[in-house]
């Protein structure tokens, strides 16, 4: 029985943030005293997950003492919320999800080279965070077409926001696969 759940309902950035928020709140009920995050508190979380590079995201994902945390100021108290616990990998409170056909919207910035919406093939998420991005091609195309597509998406700024946490890219044409 697979631990991975296919989430056909997650297609937009808003969907992904709402899903991440739900998982974060579920995994931190004790720290939140049963009270969900307010919108302003969740904005604090989102701001901490705007990584300037995949490397910076990787540094954060190492965590401290096996726990990856975000911090939220609530009234006079600072809450330390667990995003991932390395002890719970492959079990425990970890949530594993698969999405496909995610719609990465074009930029509103007039000066951007990002001129159109894009659809990502497959993404694997852990606790609501996109970790592995997969581009698939058919056998008539080289797996390198997937590589160039990812490179184009990076240049267009598609891997920002919640997708700035991605740690691995996989390309495949069904014959050759690279990561």
Where are these predicted regions, by residue range?
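An alpha-helical interface "stripe"
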Residues: 1-179
């Amino acid at each position: 029985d697979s631990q991975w759940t296919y989430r056909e309902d997650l297609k937009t950035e808003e969907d992904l943030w709402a899903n991440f928020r739900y998982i974060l709140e579920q995994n931190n009920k004790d720290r939140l005293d049963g009270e969900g995050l307010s919108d302003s508190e969740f904005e604090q979380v989102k701001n901490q997950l705007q990584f300037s590079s995949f490397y910076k995201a990787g540094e954060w994902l190492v965590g401290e003492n096996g726990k990856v945390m975000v911090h939220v100021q609530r009234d006079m108290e600072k809450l330390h919320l667990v995003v991932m616990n390395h002890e719970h990998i492959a079990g425990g409170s970890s949530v594993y999800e698969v999405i496909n056909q995610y719609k990465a919207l074009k930029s509103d910035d007039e000066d951007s080279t990002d001129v159109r919406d894009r659809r990502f093939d497959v993404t694997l998420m852990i606790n609501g965070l996109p970790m592995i991005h997969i581009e698939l091609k058919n056998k008539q195309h080289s797996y390198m077409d997937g590589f160039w597509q990812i490179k184009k998406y990076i240049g267009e700024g598609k891997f920002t926001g919640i997708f700035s946490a991605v740690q691995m890219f996989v390309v495949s044409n069904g014959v050759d696969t690279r990561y």
